[in-house]
A protein has these predicted regions:
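Rhodanese-like catalytic fold shared by cysteine-dependent sulfurtransferases
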Residues: 1-20, 27-61, 67-103
Length: 103
């Protein structure tokens, strides 16, 4: 797991052909906008969150974000414990995101 600045996260993501963007916010938060092409799994679903992660391809690189960077950091730690080796946390989260936004 690595905490990446907004610039590092966006730069790595743009060059990564093996990337999956993971949004761990709630449905209500996602309705306010999201990073394009992201997959949403709400971390507050507890075991449901873990169950969904278990279905994901561990060989991919995961770029994980939430509103401020706290939940996504927790999500990256959970992912590491489940055997995901490449989970990157977006420092500052969506509220500091300056890239493209979808609604």
């Amino acid at each position: 797991m690595a905490d990446l600045s907004q610039e590092e996260w966006a730069s790595r993501l743009a060059q990564d052909d093996n990337a999956i963007i993971l949004d761990v916010r709630t449905d209500t938060e996602v309705e306010e906008g999201f990073i394009p092409n992201s997959v949403n799994i709400d971390i507050y679903k507890g075991q449901g969150f873990i169950d969904e992660l278990e279905k994901m391809d561990k060989s991919k690189n995961y770029y994980v974000y939430c509103r401020s960077g706290n939940r996504s950091g927790q999500a990256c730690a959970i992912m590491n414990s489940l055997g995901f080796e490449n989970a990157f946390n977006l420092e500052g989260g969506f509220m500091n995101w300056e890239g493209e936004v979808a609604e």
